[in-house]
């Protein structure tokens, strides 16, 4: 009978709904995690009732995690100085991100969560610049920052900083891990930095864009893409400068151009600058080196002395070198400085605590920017 069929369907629907409600009620409440507290500590939590151990990796290690009767592991960090901190969980030795913290980053092939405790490294109520992803010469992708108030149709022309990433990075490294747009917005608004265009190109010859955006089949990120230190990127760099000058209202004199990079990007910076001594007035080398050794067997980096002397003769307005005291490239960096001394190349040297880290590179950028285009 139609009435009986309707009743059966209704009973089935009620049963399914009741089961769903029971399952929802039994599901654990998602704990709050990645919470910055008033005392500058960060609260972490993850639901893992069957785990034998939960530890914290990254910048927030070591933070002791303790399991509660509700199956939630909780921990609280030490009081943190203002900065940008990354972390992840190891649940029974399996690395995983924090499911309760939506803020994630990719560094090379690794995903982590992050918390920001430094106001200068996050968005503030100030005029904001624009961040664009553009395809430059030879199909190379670049991130371009233009400052607040930028209007390509106006008569105003801007100085340009070219900012290069390290090994395993791409055009997203400085904007995301380096927090460059936030730093620029806040420092420009504070009157500490001259409004400028900042060009952050992909420096991987074999991969012209970040993973997922590279033309062709999607490729997973790798820590050392091929052909990154064989001279090709350095040789192609004048074409990037020419492209930027033809697409943006730039000032094209040497005193209005700066070039800086971290690690491999600092290595690229020095070799680009020595090959083009009249192109850049300001040069920044962050945790970098001159001789690739185990990283490359290319002959293009042999005998840099004559080109360094030509760079010295061109008298850069600033050559700024920064490195951490425990950086694994400290010895190579000292060898680079010895080559500079031998060539008569003047530089400003900054030694900091810490090693080969984004914390240092963000700090170096903040030290370098106010020195530009004065």
Question: Where do the PLM segments sit?
Answer:
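N-terminal secretory signal peptides that target proteins for export/translocation
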Residues: 1-7
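Bacterial N-terminal signal peptides
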Residues: 11-22
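Hydrophobic alpha-helical membrane-insertion segments, chiefly the h-region
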Residues: 22-24, 167
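Cleaved targeting-peptide boundary
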Residues: 24-32
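Non-catalytic cap/lid and distal C-terminal segments of serine-dependent acyl enzymes
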Residues: 30, 36-63, 67-374
